[in-house]
């Protein structure tokens, strides 16, 4: 392996918009500001909204689905 070709790997502070901070290592070399982290992300906090797509599926079927025609009674 060649010496002195890799960038410096330094410890930096990551700050979230919610105010949470943590330390990590990066070649960036300066503090990093992020919008969402594991403290405030809806997936990790349990405040995730589940989108009900049943209405969309029914709307699609009405628009593009095959229409079921009544068959004449045998007799």
Swiss-Prot record:
BP-aspect Gene Ontology terms: translation
Annotated InterPro entries: Ribosomal_bL28/bL31-like_sf (IPR034704), Ribosomal_bL31 (IPR002150), Ribosomal_bL31_A (IPR027491), Ribosomal_bL31_sf (IPR042105)
Record protein name field: Large ribosomal subunit protein bL31
UniProt GO cellular component terms: ribonucleoprotein complex; ribosome
Gene: rpmE
Amino acids binding Zn(2+): 16, 18, 37, 40
Cofactors: Zn(2+)
The protein's role, per its UniProt record: Binds the 23S rRNA.
Cofactor notes: Binds 1 zinc ion per subunit.
